[in-house]
Amino acid sequence: MYAVFQSGGKQHRVSEGQTVRLEKLDIATGETIEFAEVLMVANGEEVKIGVPFVDGGVIKAEVVAHGRGEKVKIVKFRRRKHYRKQQGHRQWFTDVKITGISA
């Protein structure tokens, strides 16, 4: 059984027991969260597709950890003009473990 849900403006395909990295959520580690924006649920041959969301579709998950991703370097450079600019960015994330899918 798997499902597709929406969180942080992105869509994620998950199955039970899987750990997913999402955009940062303001929820403490160890707490549970329910995602109601379920776009699709598939159980073998039976597939439910939402318009836009599946009625009664809920994905339950437990927050495992928070952290920051790898550093991305941004470089601006103009040749022959003595202009160089560097900037770095590390995006916050939340790891969640899917504990249940229902539709």
Curated annotation (Swiss-Prot):
Keywords: Ribonucleoprotein, Ribosomal protein, RNA-binding, rRNA-binding. One of its GO terms (biological process) is translation. GO terms for molecular function: rRNA binding; structural constituent of ribosome. One of its GO terms (cellular component) is cytoplasm. It comes from the Bacteria. Pfam families: Ribosomal_L21p. Belongs to the bacterial ribosomal protein bL21 family. This protein binds to 23S rRNA in the presence of protein L20. PANTHER family: 50S RIBOSOMAL PROTEIN L21, LARGE RIBOSOMAL SUBUNIT PROTEIN BL21M. Part of the 50S ribosomal subunit. Contacts protein L20. This is Large ribosomal subunit protein bL21. The lineage of its organism: Bacteria, Pseudomonadati, Pseudomonadota, Gammaproteobacteria, Enterobacterales. The gene is rplU.
